[in-house]
Amino acid sequence: MGKRLLDKLWERHVVTTNENGLDLLYIDLHLVHEVTSPQAFEGLRLTNRTVRRPDLTFATMDHNIPTKDVWNITDRIAKQQLDTLRANCKQFQVPLADIGDEEQGIVHVIGPELGLTQPGKTIVCGDSHTATHGAFGALAFGIGTSEVEHVLATQTLWQRKPKAMGIELKGKLQKGVYAKDIILHLLSKYGVAVGTGYVMEFYGETIQVMEMEERMTLCNMAIEGGAKAGIIAPDEKTFAYVKGRKYAPRDYETFEKKWFELYTDADAIYDLHISIDVTDLAPYVTWGTNPSMGVRIDEKLPEKHDVNDERAFSYMGLIPGQSTYDIPVQHVFIGSCTNSRLSDLEIAASVVKGRKVKEGVRALVVPGSKRVRDAAMQKGLHHIFEEAGFEWREPGCSMCLGMNPDQVPEGEHCASTSNRNFEGRQGKGARTHLVSPAMAAAAALYGHFVDIRKESYDGAISYS
């Protein structure tokens, strides 16, 4: 029987197996940020240990940064965490993309753009959305603070091998429908627990024509379906993306030959298989308090089925049967590790070009990294956004989570390109609706959701 991509990635990294069936995996890249690392570094100090492989560790500042003025950090805890990371990286000789550095940005944006993320690697980070890097054919997953310390000290991690889920995507997406809509559709149909105990492998004709930044969006939200990770077999698009980046292998051709072996064999069998035809897929909007509570833009909100639905409707201030077009939007956030890359900003800019944000709507664009921001400004995107009435911010996690000054006021609705819509995720009482960058941009213009497919704009990603 053939091997799945998961099998090949896993087997390449097993150091040993213990009597309980746990495998000790070697970790190729450890990404670090200011929130989940302080206790881990302190643990090293208390035991008089060092970081085993500083050269395989890379840190950045992202979660706590105030994106309006990155140098004016007024929150005491945020400043302490940022200062602590800076001191820890200096003491343990870990490379750091500090505030103002050209490499700084959201950890899951800078990894790929710097070439740190590569096919075949095991990648961990103390952050749920580490699965993003799986778009490159890497086995990438989030870990807890105690595991962060373990990896810092040993460059290994004890893990039980997950099962493999194959998700075949076939068909061609309509204009105005994106990877964000695919994953929201998957979650709405199968729920937030469908991937529990699995690694999701996305494959099929839709994936083959999808660009790398869209693939990252898919893998980023695999965790929202309960999966350990999301992966996509690397191909020519992957190799072209990695080649020439700062931390890409110097002996690139040798690595590329190894990367070509990273695919699921034709006779391999997945533990669970799902097939989705995306041809008739529509833009999605979440209405509730987890990412599976979503509907097509042309559907009414569902009826209540259980106490969770009842609580979600109450929290969100919505009613069953309500039209998605009638959901008010007071805030728009275009950013996060899900949708803050250059192509995301280009799409949003094409929607708002020459138009104005609806009066009473606060709209933010937060590039995912300094490099994304600079590239967008070279293209003049910041002028398009600012002339339309958007705020153009510095890179950081921003309004994705209520951990910095960028928050949604209690009881108000936000069209967000982020990945989670939990209660209080964007601030106490904030009401979050997950959408694609195109849908978020359009909502800013109208003050409510509209069907982006009916809008005239030139921001469709080419799937030719």
From Swiss-Prot:
Pfam families according to UniProt: Aconitase
Keyword RNA-binding: no
Associated pathway: Amino-acid biosynthesis; L-leucine biosynthesis; L-leucine from 3-methyl-2-oxobutanoate: step 2/4
Binding note for cofactor: Binds 1 [4Fe-4S] cluster per subunit.
Catalytic reaction equation(s): (2R,3S)-3-isopropylmalate = (2S)-2-isopropylmalate
Assigned EC number: 4.2.1.33
Record-linked Gene3D superfamilies: Aconitase, domain 3 (3.30.499.10)
Keyword annotations of the record: 4Fe-4S, Amino-acid biosynthesis, Branched-chain amino acid biosynthesis, Iron, Iron-sulfur, Leucine biosynthesis, Lyase, Metal-binding
Cofactor annotation: [4Fe-4S] cluster
Class of the enzyme per the UniProt entry, highest EC level: lyase
Alphabetical GO biological process terms: L-leucine biosynthetic process
GO terms assigned for molecular function: 3-isopropylmalate dehydratase activity; 4 iron, 4 sulfur cluster binding; metal ion binding
Entry binding sites for [4Fe-4S] cluster: C337, C397, C400
Primary role: Catalyzes the isomerization between 2-isopropylmalate and 3-isopropylmalate, via the formation of 2-isopropylmaleate.
Family annotation (PANTHER family): 3-ISOPROPYLMALATE DEHYDRATASE, HOMOACONITASE, MITOCHONDRIAL-RELATED
Self-association state and partner proteins as the record states: Heterodimer of LeuC and LeuD.
Sequence similarity: Belongs to the aconitase/IPM isomerase family. LeuC type 1 subfamily.
HAMAP family: LeuC_type1 (MF_01026)
This protein's name: 3-isopropylmalate dehydratase large subunit
